[in-house]
Amino acid sequence: SKSLSSAMEYGVEQARTLLAGRAVLALTGAGISTDSGIPDYRGAGRVARHPLTFDDFMGSKQNQARYWARSYVGWSRVETAKPNPGHLALAQAEQSGRVFSIITQNVDGLHQKAGSKKVLELHGRVDQVLCTGCGDILSRPELDARIAQLNPEVNRSQDVEFTPDGDAEVEVGKS
C-alpha cells in the first residue's frame, strides 16, 4: 500500500541520515540466522519454546541428560551452517569501518564464520563447552567424540526437528 511504502521510504531515509559518516553497533538475534537453516524461537508458525535455564540444568541429572542428548544430535546443523548474506554484509560493514562491533543473542558463530572479528555473544557459543565442575573449556568436536564413545547407540542421523539453540527434539533413552 502507499502508506506502507511511504513509511518504509521514510524509515530508510532516517537510517541513511543516522548512519551518514558514522560507525554503528549492530545488534542481532535469531532472525539473522534463519536463512542459514537455524530456526528461531518466535518465527511465523513456530510454537513458542522455553529454553532450559541454567538452574534447571544444574538442578537435575535428567535435565542434563536431556540437554546433552538433544545437543549431541542437533550440533551437526550448527556445525555445518554457512553464513548468509546478512552475516556477510555485517562482516563487510565491520571491515570497512561502518560497523564497529556486533552484539548477538545467537550461539551459532555465524558472524565469525562470515569474517566478523568484534562480536560479543550474549548467550555464549555452542562450539565451546565449559565444564561446570572444573571450569575447563572443551572444543565441541572434542566433547562430541566423548559423547559418541559413551553413547554408541545414539543415532545422529535420525530425522529430527531442529531447535533454535543448536539442539534437536529427541527423547532421552531412544535413538
Q: For each predicted feature, which ranges?
A:
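Conserved catalytic core of sirtuin-type NAD+-dependent deacylases
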Residues: S1-S175
